[in-house]
Structure formats: C-alpha cells, structure tokens
Amino acid sequence: MLAAVFICLTGVSQPRFSKENEQRAAEIVSQMTLQEKAEYVGGFEDWYIRAIERLGLPAVRMADGPQGVRNNTKSTLYPSGIAAAATWDTDLIHQMGIALGQDARARGVHILLGPGANIYRSPLCGRNFEYFGEDPYLAGEIAASYIIGVQSQGVMASVKHFAANNQEYARHSVSSDVDERTLHEIYFPAFEKAVKKAEVATVMTSYNLLNSVHASESKYLNYDVLRDMWGFKGLVMSDWISCYSPLNIATWGVDLEMPSPICMTPELLVEYVKNGTLAEEYLDRKCQHIIQTIFAFDFDKRPQLDKSIPENNPYSDSVALEISRGAIVMLKNQDNFLPVKKGNFFVCGPNAGKIVTGGGSGFVTPIITSTVSQAMTSIDKKVKATVISDKAKTKIDGMYADRSMSIPGVSVELYSNVNLEGEPVSRYVSDKVFLSGKPAEAHEDVVASRLSSRHTFYFTPEVDVTYVLKINGNDGCRFYINGELKDSAWGRDSWQYITTEYDFKAGHQYEVVVEHYNRGGTNGLELIFDSPVLVNESEAEKIKAADCVVVCIGHDNTSEKENHDRTFELPKEHIEYLRSVLALSDNVVVVLNGGGGIEMGSWLPDVKAVLMAWYPGQQGGTAISEIITGKVSPSGKLPISIEARLEDNPSYKHYYENVPRMRVPSINPYSRLEYREGIFMGYRGYEKNDVKPLYPFGYGLSYTSFEYTDLQILQDGREYVVSFNIKNVGKVAGAEIAQVYVTDDECSVLRPEKELKGFDKVFLKPGETKRVSIKLGDEAFRFYDLNRHDFTVEPGSFTISVASSSADIRLTGKLEVLAIDK
C-alpha cells in the first residue's frame, strides 16, 4: 500500500484557464514593447521562460521528465512510461503524477517536460520506453492520469512529442507521412485526451515533419487541430533546437522556441514587423498564450520552490516501488517454476548489479538504488550474486597517433562536409576517440552540425587481449581494423550504437580507424573499450549448484535512447552470456530490460521463466525480488504486442530499413516514412494480417487464476454499462486487468477486428468476487469519417468482448447503437 501523500501543498488553487486570466494576459501584452515581445517568444538560459520584471512576469523554469525531475541533481527515478502503461492502473499513475509534481516543487521547477504520449509503432524506436504503448485508448488514459496528478501540485505538464514521432531515426529530417484517418484514430487520441480530459498546460512539438511540414511550424497541428478542433488554451513549445524556418515559425508555429531564440531571433522578428513581412499580431498571440498559461498556474502570485518538501521524498520512493511492482509482466512460467520461496539462488548477468534505464533526456540519476543483486541478497542472506563490474574505458595503454608509434594518442582529421571529401580542414591529436560539439582545435570552417571526421590510432598489445569495441555516434559511424570494415551504421542519420568483439594478439600492430559524420543536431562520437562478459570458473560452480539462476539481461541507456533507434535483438554480449549460463543450468529465470519487443526465439524454449521488467526505476530490484520469491504476485500486462520475428510487425515493410531515402536537396531534402499500415498497427494489424504474435497485447501471467461470469450490458442514457463478475479462484491474492473490446459488426468502412475501449485493474483475495462495471460512451463506437473530417458513429450492432488479453476473450455480448443526434 502507498504511504499517505507526504506533503499537502497549500496556497495552490487548481490550475484553470479562465476568461479572467485571458483578459489579464491581454492587458500585459498590450503593455509590452515590440522588443519585449520578440525576446519573450524564445527560451532563456536553456531552461527558462524569461522574466519581465516591470510587468510582473516571473522567470519560469523547466526540467526534463518524464521518468523523474532531471535537474542536474539526483532525483527519484520512476519506472519508465511503458512500465507505467503496463500497470494499467490509472489511480496509481495519478499518484505518480502527484509525486512528480512534488519532486518538481522541491526543486523550484515550474514545467515538467512530460509525459511522452507517442504511440508504439515498432520495437526499433529508441524512445519507446518513454511512451505508453501501442493502443491509443490505453495511452490516453495513462497520460491523462499522469498529467492531472502533476498539475494538481501546481506544476505544468508538457505532453510530447506532437505528432507522429514514432522513430528516432533521422528525426530532424524525416517526414512521417500519415493519412488523416490514421492520425485521428491512432496517433492523435492520447494528445486529445491530454488536452480535453486533463487540460494539459503545454504541448511540445516533435522534431520530425508531418506530411512534409515540420511539426514546429505546422498550422494544421498547432492551430487547426490543437486549438480549433480540441480547444487547447495553453502554450505550444518546440523541442530543443527544432525550429527551421523563421517566418513559418513566427506565423503558424510554436509559441515558444526552446532552448533559445536560434531561429526566431529577436533581431529578425523586429525587422520582419518593421518591414511589414510579419504582422505584430502574430507575436501578440504567442505572448498571450504563454502569459495566460502562467496566470492559470498563479506563477506570478507565489513562489514555486517549496522547501517543506524534501528532495528525497519518501512518498515519491513509495510510489516508484508500487509502480514497479505493478508493471512487471510475467511472460513465461514453465511448470509454475516461480515463485521460488526457498532454495539456493544465484543472481548474475550484465544488468544484475546496476540501475537500468533508457538514455537521453529521460535519463535520471536516482537518489536511491535497489539493484536485483542487492534486493535478492537483502531478502535472503544465503542468496549468492555476481555483479559484473563495469570495465569499460575510453582509452587504453599503448594508443599512438602514428604508425611509428612515437606520438601518443589518436590522430583526428575533421572535414567541413559529411562525406570525408577533399582535404581535412583540421588535424590534431587527441587522447581518445571522442567528439562533443565543435572541438576547440577545429578550424573556423567546421560547423558542428555538419561535419565528418576520421580518427586513427595504432596499437601493439604486449599480451593477447580481447576487447568489445563499442561506438556511439551521431549521425553515422563505422570502424576498420587493419583496413577491414568491422561494423557500420553509415547512412542512418541518427544516433548510432555499434559493437564488435575483437581478439588482439600480442606483438601484432593494429591500425584502428573510426569514421563518423553529423548531418544535423548534436555532434557526438565516442569509442569505448569494454571486456567480454564471461562466466568464470567460480560462477560456473555456483550456477550448477543453484536451484534458481536469475539472469538479468537487456538494453540500457547505451543501446536504447533518444536520437537513436535500437535493434530488435539483445546486445550480442548479453545473448552470449545467457547461452553460457544455459549450458550449465536448466533452472534459469530471465529478467529482461527494454522499452519494447525483443527477439526471444533463440533462447526462450530453454528458460523456465521470463519477467519483462522494462526500466523499473530506482526500486526495480526490490519489486523483481519480491515477485521471484512470491511476496508479490505479478500483475502487469503488456501495453504492446511482442512479435516472434521483427518481420511480423505490421509496420515492418514501411519502417526505415525498407524505405528508400531521398536526399536530393533540390527535390526532397528529407526522408519520407509512409505509414502504409494505416490504422492496422499493433494488435489491430496482427489480427487483420492473421499473424500470431509471440505475446499478445494485454497479456500477462499471475500466480493465481481468475474466473469471469455474469455479463450484463445495460443502456444508461447515451452510455452503455458493461458489468461482470471476476473471481480469484486461486490460492494467493492477486490483481486481474479486465479489458473490454468493441467490434463494429457491420460498417461502411473497414475497421479493426476489435478495439480496446475500457479496462479496470481489480485486486482480489483468494476466493473473493467483485462486480466490475465499465462505461462505454460515443468514443467506444466511433470512427473517423474522411467525408466529414470528423468522428461519426454508425447505428447498428456491436459485439462487446470482455477479455484477459486481446487474445483471451472470456465473455461476449451484443448491443444495438441507435442513431446519435449531434
């Protein structure tokens, strides 16, 4: 059970947009000078809306989310967004929002840059872990609960990234080409619910283009949909460095350019207004939106920093633990191997001894750490655990910049183009393979956002040594050893991660060359030397003797992160480690980390159990150990479908690896990703294509069983109430997530076989029965009509399915929907 809310904030009214606040804002705008307006629509010192003291406008501070308040200090690290969705528990996610709001107030933060509400389209997207899964209804309900919680504490939430940001590949230059119906039925609803149900304060646009127009300057997104269709009253901000055309941004683009006025510079805006290119009313409108949002939260009337809230808030920690408990999905439990309440445990694997999380702006350094190895040994002192120490380093002894090995370091050549063409414009020696931004040694012609580089060093080991060479680079990278290409991610145009294991022989000289280019965005490159993950002799004996071997593997912040699409497969060294353990034991439980689907077919038949732990936050180790030992019954269910093969995913043929990249600037300066699967993505697509996923949407095992009975469907005005009984027929307490799907039995347009339209998480003691009621309104039966450019409901027969997962229907019934008067 959650502890009571630690702090009850005083003096903070429920945030609201009102005519009074709009009028106050208009009065302030009327007093602003043109220069002040031009400056106000650009960020200040990277993380602020600037203050205008003479008008009583405060500085407004932002911080990254959404897994915690990322503020250059330690903070509570919550489970990732996809883990939050896996709880299917809106009450709990509301508590998460409250806790995040308190964390923000404890640090004086006004705007939390979260949640992320993009839809999971493919397992490859590097930021899936931040989002709420593949279903728009589930994502919308989780997002709204999160936002309402955050904003109840006097902190603005910022729902992101609007819209169709479903890949990190080439995110500055890729156009998500999505048809109108698919946008409104799949990719818009979570944002719509954030606006209409949660009254979110701010919306952040995405880096990508939507149908050939950058989101940050799209009139369709920022005005036609957000404001005219949904009635949004708040402010729209850009993602960091995602504004491209000054005049387009100034007219129909975002209200606020972050992190600073790089595109909409004050000088340019003032010039545009004075020469008649831009009407001043456009700036008035942007300032109006920003100021009325500030007034809605009373930021001008109270301090945001609340010193009565500790940064290490016990309530926040308890919420993080409860979410982790509810998020973990048990995918496999052969012969009821789990729970193992007594016996000889051995805990191992690359992720056993560390807090595992995704990378990028969602990365948070936790205040408290509970790893799996720590938690398992604290539960039972007899538990043996091996923590694989981090032996990674960015430089090794004996690196030389020349073949004669007289100059220590790495030879670096920089080019003022992205193709390593012509002569390098800068040459220098570095102590390692590393770039961040524009190097101090770079020639003035080098632009960090458009360059290429070659890094060369020579190495003669004194003894045989094996290194796992890992390269992170933006946008493309590749490397050679003695002239032979060893790995490449060239031409992908996003942050890349490549890795190769190589045996270096004593006395042999090796030439290592790393090449890289950056076509846009943040420039970065790093070569890491790591050691292979191996089972040593001591571990082997413990593995053989153990009744239960817990192997912790998966992705982390190096392989799954912002600005980088990941692989469907696990890191190679993790797979090799698991195989070495499986050669020694038949009693293996795999704890998986990741933000989505992972290839499992090569090892799944050989393990006893699999727990999908996602990125479980700072208390993840505790929750995992409690489930393994039976103190908690697993209750999470998949907010995604997990495919057996990547090729099975409905978007596979239309994701980047199968779409030609067009890069002729005079014709098309960006890539086009056509969402040809349309509305048939996720479980909708698997069912239409008659493809069985490895694990279906809504699936998750428990230590107990549940029985569904007595379905009733009653009409209540314009709503229908679907009610039924759920009984815990097992011997332990547990929670079941009942799911209600709706099928349109006959429609004038092609619709999915069924769609999720309601759910409830029900906690039951052994033998206990509860009556569950779920209401279905117009939203449950509608589809987007392209002729009307609006949603419509066709009268007729609908099938109601009550299910334990999308593939496990327990009860069905029928209802008739009559014509609905608009």
Where are these regions (language model features)?
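Bacterial N-terminal signal peptides
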Residues: 1-8
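Short beta-strand elements
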Residues: 808-822
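Glycoside hydrolase catalytic-domain context in secreted enzymes
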Residues: 8-468, 472-786, 792-806, 821
